[in-house]
Amino acid sequence: GTHITAMGADGDNKNEVASSVFAKADIIVNDSVSQCEVDGDTSFAIRDGVITADSPVELGLLIKDDIKRANDEQITLVDLTGIAVQDIIVAEMVCDCLLK
């Protein structure tokens, strides 16, 4: 098993993970499924017919529903295109840590 996090492809013309990798992934996670359908690596995999639009799990549901690998052999793939509110919260946490 392995884990891949893709976070550099934030546009419809950017791609860092081949669509064939999505076909091998047991669990696919997006920070925003609707956004990743249009931008980033997930959009290429959908356009290439390797996965369907309902294949990825949204990050919030992953946490809420406690979705995880069933065994160490599974492959997990996370495609993050960037959500402004998440960036703001992380930046706030970093600033808080720096000011302590």
What are these regions (language model features)?
Residues 6-8:
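Acidic carboxylate diad motif detector
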Residues 10-100:
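Adenosine-phosphate binding glycine-rich loop
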